[in-house]
Amino acid sequence: MKIRSQVGMVLNLDKCIGCHTCSVTCKNVWTSREGVEYAWFNNVETKPGQGFPTDWENQEKYKGGWIRKINGKLQPRMGNRAMLLGKIFANPHLPGIDDYYEPFDFDYQNLHTAPEGSKSQPIARPRSLITGERMAKIEKGPNWEDDLGGEFDKLAKDKNFDNIQKAMYSQFENTFMMYLPRLCEHCLNPACVATCPSGAIYKREEDGIVLIDQDKCRGWRMCITGCPYKKIYFNWKSGKSEKCIFCYPRIEAGQPTVCSETCVGRIRYLGVLLYDADAIERAASTENEKDLYQRQLDVFLDPNDPKVIEQAIKDGIPLSVIEAAQQSPVYKMAMEWKLALPLHPEYRTLPMVWYVPPLSPIQSAADAGELGSNGILPDVESLRIPVQYLANLLTAGDTKPVLRALKRMLAMRHYKRAETVDGKVDTRALEEVGLTEAQAQEMYRYLAIANYEDRFVVPSSHRELAREAFPEKNGCGFTFGDGCHGSDTKFNLFNSRRIDAIDVTSKTEPHP
């Protein structure tokens, strides 16, 4: 057993209001520059829908993630090394800019410079940020399907409608929707790492964050295809691939990510999970896709177990990280209460950004008396959002974990309503789903109140273990892709626009 630590995230979809604050703040901090105008490290999608980029869940088209071979071994869906090498100069499974959208701005200056004698009111026409030319019509955007925008024929192409009679959901009275914030999953078994020909992508040992070494990256873009969540973007200005860095400078300081910090709905939780690194391959190679969720749970370790603590210390896990794991809200929601579920575990990457399925539309339907009663709790299998749809999204089609999570959330609400409204203790619903009163009270504290100190338990990094950064700063300066060499742009056969270094010139004002 080799114990490692990972900073994971849980998003409570029951409280997401689709305000896109997380997307905007992430965009302003990390990708508001030339070359990645189209890139959104964090975006919020409306489901059902094809998402961003279009149809990203269709792995028959994009070949992302892993497949299990007949001999039980894993292989990237793109193919083995020889097959990857054969596609290195022409990757047929790479999403194009039209699968994302052509980034644009508007000619606002025209509103000020238009001649006064014009017969029509001046307008700000869209202009492409890639070509610089004016656009006749905006065809697409990062949240083009926001709030069920578009006709149902396009929304019905959502892969999560598999095994569902989707025709009935085209009728207005049967319409449903939910918000799905997405970011890099920082997987335990990342396919992007395996498909990178340059070996530029790595997973940090201390916190599990997956990063791209900008010095090693050569812009082959195989990682974009390899990532089944399509959360790696190509910077056409620098010729490098970029992705969500989980705000690691903030994580190292014990602070939450920008998207978590600015979330107005308090839906995001950050915490440490201890896992057995030796069990990753066995878990990801599970034959039945529906068992992948449980196999990933088996990889996680109990931070309160004395044997686990002893082994973690031997493996170099700092005591502060172990203590943070014991207080982790992610561990509580994923392991203790089993409310949080992984996004598309069938990709076999063992994702580490998990989701609590939405309950709000279900609860409102129950209040209106539209549902049959199953004992104390309503029958959650006949609710507005199809349970099979949530299962296709979160548990590879297995409805049992989704039903358990929904019933436990309903039971907690039933218990708290009896306590606050009726002034009595009614534990019948809790007993039906296997929860104690203490667990229900703690669930209420974390899910409903969601205090800052409960949502974010992030240990600061141990700077005493890091090497001195001043010599690196003094020797290398600001470089991208060319190590510690000069700022001259070298010849590049595949991308002449690549920037190897940025010149930083200092200007000194003359003394009077």
UniProtKB/Swiss-Prot annotation:
Binding residues for [3Fe-4S] cluster: 196, 217, 223
Compartments, as annotated in UniProt: Cell membrane
Cofactor dependency: [4Fe-4S] cluster; [3Fe-4S] cluster
The reaction(s) this protein catalyses: nitrate + a quinol = a quinone + nitrite + H2O
Species annotation: Escherichia coli (strain K12)
CDD domains: NarH_beta-like
InterPro entries: 4Fe4S_Fe-S-bd, Nitr_red_bet_C, Nitr_red_bet_C_sf, NO3_Rdtase_bsu
Cofactor note text: Binds 3 [4Fe-4S] clusters per subunit.
Gene Ontology biological process terms in this record: anaerobic electron transport chain; anaerobic respiration; nitrate assimilation; nitrate metabolic process
EC number: 1.7.5.1
Amino acids binding [4Fe-4S] cluster 3: 184, 187, 192, 227
Physiological role: The nitrate reductase enzyme complex allows E.coli to use nitrate as an electron acceptor during anaerobic growth. The beta chain is an electron transfer unit containing four cysteine clusters involved in the formation of iron-sulfur centers. Electrons are transferred from the gamma chain to the molybdenum cofactor of the alpha subunit.
Topology versus the membrane: Peripheral membrane protein
Primary localization: membrane
Domain annotation 4Fe-4S ferredoxin-type: ranges: 7-35, 175-206, 208-237
GO CC aspect terms: membrane; NarGHI complex
Residue positions binding [4Fe-4S] cluster 1: 16, 19, 22, 263
Keyword list, A-Z: 3Fe-4S, 4Fe-4S, Cell membrane, Electron transport, Iron, Iron-sulfur, Membrane, Metal-binding, Nitrate assimilation, Oxidoreductase, Repeat, Transport
Coiled-coil residue windows: none
Induction: By nitrate.
Protein name (database record): Respiratory nitrate reductase 1 beta chain
Self-association and partners: Dimer of heterotrimers each composed of an alpha, a beta and a gamma chain. Alpha and beta are catalytic chains; gamma chains are involved in binding the enzyme complex to the cytoplasmic membrane.
GO MF annotation list: 3 iron, 4 sulfur cluster binding; 4 iron, 4 sulfur cluster binding; electron transfer activity; metal ion binding; nitrate reductase (quinone) activity; nitrate reductase activity
UniProt-annotated binding residues for [4Fe-4S] cluster 2: 26, 244, 247, 259
Root EC class: oxidoreductase
Record-linked SUPFAM superfamilies: 4Fe-4S ferredoxins
